[in-house]
C-alpha cells in the first residue's frame, strides 16, 4: 500500500448521524517512518485542521479508538491503529473553576434540620411538597444555582434526587458527618426547608423560620417557592404567591453564615450539565416515605449503618445505597430506552453494557457526558 493510501476515518462522538470525515495523512511528514510513527498529539492537530469549524483547538478534544481514550504521548502503532480505522472525537469544554461551599453555622443548621425532620415525619402535605419540589428539574436547577459547591458534589446531588436518601440525610444526627464532608448538601437542605416553608404550613410551632414573611423566602437564594412548578402543584398555600417588594432586603438562612451577594450567580451551561451528569440516581424513587414506613426504610437502607456509626460517607457507600433504585428501574427497559446510544458506544469499542447503561442513565442519555463519565478514570 502506497503512502497516499494512508488515511483514517474521523467521527464526532456528539454527532452520530453525521458522515465520517476522511483524514489523509501528509506524506511529506512521514519521511522514512510509517503511519504508525505519528503521535496522538500530532493526529489531534491534523484533525483540528481538517474539522476547523467543529474542532477549533486540538487541546479541546480526546480521541477514542476501540473503547480506549488515546494518550497524547503514544503513537498510532501503540494502539494498533491501521489505515482505514475509525477514530472517534470527543469534544471537551474548558473546566469551570471550583466553587467552595459556603460555611455552615452548625448550631443554626441543627435547629433547621430538627424542624425539617419533624415536618417530614408528621405532615404528609409538607412531605409531599418537599418531594414534588426535588423531583422538578427547574426547582433542582435553582437549588444548584443558589448553593455554591453543590454542582461539584455528586453525592449531594444524588441525595437531593432520591426520596429515601433525602429522608435519611435530613436527620439531625447526620450533621456531624455532613458538615465537614458535604457542607453544600447541608446548605441545600436548609434552602429546601425555607423554600417549602413559604408555601406549605409547618406542622410545628417551635421554628424560627415560621415568623419570616413569604417575601423573605422568595428573595433568598433557593427561596423560589415552587416557581418552577405548574399551578396545580402550587395550591398548598395560595397566599404565598404574593408579589415581593423590591425594597425588601434579601435574607438568607442563618446556617449559611455568608455576607456576600444575596442574589443567585449566573450558572454556566457546562457547570449545570456537569452537575446533572454527576447526579447518578434515578429522577425519583417510586416510593414516598410515610411516617409509618420511614423508620423501616431508613433502618434497612445501606446508609443506616453510617448514620449510627458516624463514619464518613464514601462514593462506594453511596453507590450501594442507590443500587436498589437502579435495580428497580429494570435493566431490560433501560436497554430498550438507550439502545441507540448503547450501539454508538459499542461502535466506539465500549462493550461493557452495564457500565454504559449506568453512564447513560446518569446523564439522561447524553452520549457526550456519558463518555466523559466512562473515561473519568483515564485510559485502561
UniProtKB/Swiss-Prot annotation:
The protein's name in its UniProt record: Ubiquitin-like protein 7
MF terms (GO), sorted A to Z: polyubiquitin modification-dependent protein binding
Residues carrying Phosphoserine: 230
Chain ranges of the UBA domain: 333-377
Any single Pfam family the record assigns to this protein: ubiquitin
Residue ranges occupied by any Ubiquitin-like domain in the UniProt entry: 18-98
Membrane-crossing segments per the record: none
Description of how the protein assembles with itself and partners: Binds ubiquitin. Interacts with MAVS; this interaction enhances TRIM21-dependent 'Lys-27'-linked polyubiquitination of MAVS.
PANTHER family in UniProt: UBIQUILIN, UBIQUITIN-LIKE PROTEIN 7
PROSITE patterns (UniProt xref): UBA, UBIQUITIN_2
Biased composition (Low complexity): 239-255, 270-312
Gene: UBL7
Lineage top rank: taxon: Eukaryota
One biological process term in Gene Ontology: innate immune response
Keywords: Immunity, Innate immunity, Phosphoprotein, Ubl conjugation pathway
